[in-house]
Amino acid sequence: MQALSILPLKSGLLVGSRLEFELDCSCFVVSPKTTRKRLCFLEQACFGSSSSISSFIFVSSNRKVLFLCEPKRSLLGSSFGVGWATEQRELELGEEEVSTEDLSSANGGEKNNLRVDVRELAFSLRAAKTADDVDAVLKDKGELPLQVFCAMIKGFGKDKRLKPAVAVVDWLKRKKSESGGVIGPNLFIYNSLLGAMRGFGEAEKILKDMEEEGIVPNIVTYNTLMVIYMEEGEFLKALGILDLTKEKGFEPNPITYSTALLVYRRMEDGMGALEFFVELREKYAKREIGNDVGYDWEFEFVKLENFIGRICYQVMRRWLVKDDNWTTRVLKLLNAMDSAGVRPSREEHERLIWACTREEHYIVGKELYKRIRERFSEISLSVCNHLIWLMGKAKKWWAALEIYEDLLDEGPEPNNLSYELVVSHFNILLSAASKRGIWRWGVRLLNKMEDKGLKPQRRHWNAVLVACSKASETTAAIQIFKAMVDNGEKPTVISYGALLSALEKGKLYDEAFRVWNHMIKVGIEPNLYAYTTMASVLTGQQKFNLLDTLLKEMASKGIEPSVVTFNAVISGCARNGLSGVAYEWFHRMKSENVEPNEITYEMLIEALANDAKPRLAYELHVKAQNEGLKLSSKPYDAVVKSAETYGATIDLNLLGPRPDKKNRP
């Protein structure tokens, strides 16, 4: 609820919203003795769809006029309820006494209630451009309270109709000269005009007009100026109003300080706003400010503290959505808020986490998560899921797993999304382990999943099997395969292929045959990789007749041997010292229109060179160069060494310079 200001009047008490008094206000008169005899209801003071002011005027024969209005929303749109000219402590209600005779009907001079329709009156003036236009409408209206003009001017301002607002003031200035100063624009009229003209660069002109009319600005005027400069982007000029008010002998009030904080908000200067508040709090503690008895400063400071927390949150959110990386600023402001004793709410912490969407934001998200866990008893599950996603995006998978572990240990209970997010991170980690052959890491990840109640799926087991195969860890591959079956997962062709490869690299050819036969028995169709592995197994056993049968079987199933398949055979022959057989398979792959690559030539050249066939190795090297292949230095050195050892004559110029290891493609 808003604080209420209670001001004494001659006829009672004025009760109104402290923060929304001068403009967009709600107030009423409380009379301890008499009742209200005259009541005039002024409906809407503005006619646009974007604004609404409900207004009342209470009139009695012995009482002054009290104007009230109530808006649909705060002009600043701030949750703090700060109006840009929302307070006037020196409001002198009843400065212009309304004659009840003027409001009475012609029925025998009896005084009756008269309804003044401000909305209709303002609507009739909407096209006014000069004082003459206003006079044409108001000449038969008699004397109207100045509050009516204030309401209309504010309404024109909200509807961006500046010409009729200025025309009304010009008409009042004319009336002032005609009435000898009895009727004319006063401070409240000019404050209303100043507010209506904000955003149109007319502030200086209005101030000059006030000076010519001999009207001295008050604190509301300066508060309004501060907002005007802020909306025009003149932030330093807006903050300079604080010093100007003191120079003019006015003490800044809570609205002044709140508006200054809003300026820092518009500047997106969270540190500046926080430093301003800390300095303000120190001055209040020393009683250098807050001595105005018209305010409950203790209550106002509670609101200011809430407001600075809100501003810091908004600024940090703006920093996080910028294209630039402002994470360091966010962390510094969070630490500065801790030092100042300003702590955002849990909801604000969580909304900041939602604003963390880029990889570099993970450090901010992690810090905010830590603060929520330490300072609050609860945290939103959706926020935790977002953090798990963010950590994965930033490749901080272990940090994501820690958050998941917190959900299991501290709550809230993870849901299906939590599970899927963590499993997806394990997929990435296991895939990396598979590609790099980091088999121990893969096994560790599987154990971690099981420890946290996450059942590894088929693709997870396969990833670790492939990692074991690449690392030539035959024993580990066998254990993983068995564990996969024991956990109820049915092996796929990838599973069998990885196991076959591991067995082949461990030269466990008989075991490989048993696995192959079992795969066929359970109905798993071999793929190219599995056939290639078995080709390598048969080559290692030198069972070339079975190898021919295997290749025919591949052809019958529409699976064409690839360069990798022939390389596996040639490589197996080379390891067993069968360079002649390797050379035959080289010609066979050519006859089957499979083009050899660098690996093919390098393995075959080395096999021939080491098998006392330097001339043939030399010719293959030259052939590879002529085909545009870039061989490494290893076959080059093998050819040169073999030629020297066996006395072969070769042309080193044709071989060219020795390849650099760094230039190996």
From Swiss-Prot:
Superkingdom assignment: Eukaryota
Choose any GO biological process term that the UniProt entry carries and state it: translational initiation
Cellular localisation: Plastid, Chloroplast thylakoid membrane; Plastid, Chloroplast stroma
GO molecular-function terms, A-Z: mRNA binding; ribosome binding; RNA binding; translation activator activity
Keywords assigned: Chloroplast, Membrane, Plastid, Repeat, RNA-binding, Thylakoid, Transit peptide
Transit peptide interval: 1-68
Repeat (PPR) positions are 145-179, 181-217, 218-252, 253-283, 309-344, 345-375, 380-414, 422-456, 457-491, 492-526, 527-561, 562-596, 597-631
Traits of the deletion mutant: Retardation of photoautotrophic growth. Reduced efficiency of photosystem II (PSII) subunit mRNAs (e.g. psbJ, psbN and psbA) ribosome loading and impaired synthesis of PSII reaction center proteins (e.g. J, N and D1) leading to reduced PSII activity and biogenesis, as well as reduced grana thylakoid formation. Reduced production of PSII subunits D1, D2, CP43, CP47, PsbE, PsbF, and PsbO, and, to a lower extent, of PSI subunits PsaA and PsaB. High levels of nonphotochemical quenching (NPQ).
Question: What exactly does this protein do?
Answer: Required for light-regulated photosystem II (PSII) biogenesis and grana thylakoids formation by binding to the 5' UTR of PSII subunit mRNAs (e.g. psbJ, psbN and psbA) in a light-dependent manner through a redox-based mechanism, and facilitating the association of HCF173 with target mRNAs, which encodes PSII reaction center proteins (e.g. J, N and D1), thus regulating its expression by modulating ribosome loading.
Q: Describe its assembly.
A: Interacts with HCF173.
PANTHER family, alphabetically? OS12G0283900 PROTEIN, PROTEIN LOW PHOTOSYNTHETIC EFFICIENCY 1, CHLOROPLASTIC
Record-stated family: Belongs to the PPR family. P subfamily.
Question: Which named protein is this?
Answer: Protein LOW PHOTOSYNTHETIC EFFICIENCY 1, chloroplastic
Organism annotation: Arabidopsis thaliana
